[in-house]
Curated annotation (Swiss-Prot):
GO terms for molecular function: inorganic diphosphate phosphatase activity; magnesium ion binding. Its main location: cytoplasm. GO terms for cellular component: cytoplasm; cytosol; nucleoplasm; nucleus. This is Soluble inorganic pyrophosphatase 1. Monomer. The gene is PPA1. Belongs to the PPase family. Catalyzes the irreversible hydrolysis of pyrophosphate (PPi) to phosphate. The MgPPi(2-) complex binds to the enzyme only after a free Mg(2+) ion has bound. No activity with glycerol-3-phosphate, glucose-6-phosphate, p-nitrophenylphosphate, ADP, NADP(+), NAD(+),NADH, NADPH or phosphoribosyl pyrophosphate as substrates. Controls the equilibrium of gluconeogenic reactions in the heterotrophic growth phase of early seedling establishment. Determinates the rate of cytosolic glycolysis, providing carbon for seed storage lipid accumulation. Its EC number is 3.6.1.1.
């Protein structure tokens, strides 16, 4: 059999049928899920909630949510030698005054890939001013990590852990000549109130959008 005949036979073979779910995903009517708007915050919110991880523990890469596409994009590489001390992300279906979802630093044993989501418990609030603007961070623990799931308040953490977190945020923009101020950590009640407020703000935003 000649090579030309073999090539013709290969061309005449019927293409394998694609899985219907793949075909559905390629449909013009299908829309990819958006991690901010489509992922549930979780039935235990504001105490226990889902977190979408943007930045991996130990990373120098500053990833962030691209609000238009819902993808995780590279914002920049940190200018200093510091790395993120813990996994960092946001709570879905929340909104803050800066028009972003509320930020969360999740304390746990292992780094988590950007784009994954996990369950977390709020244990404290870190009030922060970034270049003159409010940019508070929720401090949380992963409720599915056996080493940290028992923590319920930030005062239970070792003082060194809090110093580590504070120093990172105070220093990570210094080489960009940007000023960040971190105030005293607040207890879990303050964190829960901040999350509830951001949930309410998001709900108001959705209602306002639907009424347009």
């Amino acid at each position: 059999m000649s090579e030309e005949t073999k090539d013709n036979q290969r061309l005449q073979r019927p293409a394998p049928r694609l899985n219907e779910r793949i075909l559905s995903s390629l449909s013009r009517r299908s829309v990819a899920a958006h991690p901010w708007h489509d992922l549930e915050i979780g039935p235990g919110a504001p105490q226990i909630f889902n977190v979408v991880v943007e930045i991996t523990k130990g990373s120098k890469v500053k990833y962030e949510l691209d609000k238009k596409t819902g993808l995780i994009k590279v914002d920049r590489i940190l200018y200093s030698s510091v790395v993120y001390p813990h996994n960092y992300g946001f709570v879905p279906r929340t909104l803050c005054e800066d028009n972003d979802p509320i930020d969360v630093l999740v304390i746990m044993q292992e780094p988590v890939l950007p784009g994954c989501f996990l369950r977390a418990r709020a244990i404290g609030l870190m009030p922060m001013i970034d270049q003159g603007e409010k940019d508070d961070k929720i401090i949380a623990v992963c409720v599915d990590d056996p080493e940290y799931k028992h923590y319920t308040d930030i005062k239970e953490l070792p003082p060194h852990r809090l110093s580590e977190i504070r120093r990172f945020f105070e220093d990570y923009k210094k080489n960009e000549n940007k000023e960040v101020a971190v105030n005293d950590f607040l207890p879990s009640e303050s964190a829960v109130e901040a999350i509830q407020y951001s949930m309410d703000l998001y709900a108001e935003y959705i209602l306002h959008t639907l009424r347009r």
